[in-house]
Amino acid sequence: MTIGIVSYGAYVPRYRIKIEEIARLWGDDAEALKNGLMVYEKSVPDVDEDAATIAVEAARYAMARSGVDPSRIGAVYTGSESHPYAVKPTSTIVAQAIGATPEMTAADFEFACKAGTAAVQACMGLVGSGMIDLGLAIGADVSQGAPSDALEYTAAAGGVACLIGRKESELAAIIEDTYSFTTDTPDFWRREGMPYPEHGGRFTGEPGYFKHVTNGAKGLLEKLGTKPEDYDYAVFHQPNGKFPSKAAKILGFTKAQITPGLVVPKIGNTYSGSCLMGIAATLDQAKPGDRIFATAFGSGAGSDAFSITVTDRIEEIRNRAPKVSELIKDPVYIDYARYARHKGKIRLA
């Protein structure tokens, strides 16, 4: 059975803070940070934006592109590590907002930055089994980094929704196959009640990101019998600009393959939306017949790899909602004081 992406929608808040502004406050070397991270600014949510509102915006854009009746959606799954409620699903909020309730199922997913792709896989399973007609998978975050922590330079806000289906006439992209690689690796964590996550810093790269991304990618390539040169585009999880570039080089993908989907330099790491944002940016410009190789990563740790082929229908739906490039342009820059207010970093005892 053929399963794939019927539609997709992305959302990025319009506010930005430059690396120089954060570095100025903490006395850090902005140029060294920009060169090391390959990130120059990051998105910031408005004071009334959270993972739920971002998920709703992305879902609405996905529905606008699709043109399908929302009552056909049998499942809404939202992946995030910044759900606004500890007990109250984000996914029910989204489902109600797009008119998909009540004859459907919903749940929230968590797996650090790959919760969104985990939701995609769950929807693929339900759609493929025939249990549901369409499934909506979302990755959305308003990620947090403690003041002066290295994460503060990249932790951003944004989200992507993917409508998963099986009717070939409706598919804008076919998901040929998927492969996951998972271990128990404590590279990044946040306990209940902690306002900010903790991490192993520079020592998390090899045992966390690179081990899982390369093994997940190699696993799918071997499963399909394909090679990097068989793909027109490649997308890897983007905690910064340096890691996906290095992963691509290790695996044999070229800079030309990853550049179209590499959005982290302009918006930062959108966590659960990161890999999906790269896929969305790539779908915004891919041609029918193009192949996309994508690998998401989530700390804790695991990776989800996907092989995707774009269909003729992409030309029909692409311009029905804003492209990622359109969401990124014309940002409103703010200083650290306003950033702290937007991010809720100013707390009264």
From Swiss-Prot:
Keywords: Acyltransferase, Isoprene biosynthesis, Transferase
Binding site for CoA: R202, K242
SUPFAM superfamilies per record: Thiolase-like
Superkingdom of origin organism: Archaea
Pathway, per record: Metabolic intermediate biosynthesis; (R)-mevalonate biosynthesis; (R)-mevalonate from acetyl-CoA: step 2/3
GO molecular function: acetyl-CoA C-acetyltransferase activity; hydroxymethylglutaryl-CoA synthase activity
Keyword Transferase: yes
EC nos: 2.3.3.10
CDD domains per the UniProt record, alphabetical: init_cond_enzymes
Function per UniProt: Catalyzes the condensation of acetyl-CoA with acetoacetyl-CoA to form 3-hydroxy-3-methylglutaryl-CoA (HMG-CoA). Functions in the mevalonate (MVA) pathway leading to isopentenyl diphosphate (IPP), a key precursor for the biosynthesis of isoprenoid compounds that are building blocks of archaeal membrane lipids.
Protein name, per record: Hydroxymethylglutaryl-CoA synthase
Species of the source: Methanosarcina acetivorans (strain ATCC 35395 / DSM 2834 / JCM 12185 / C2A)
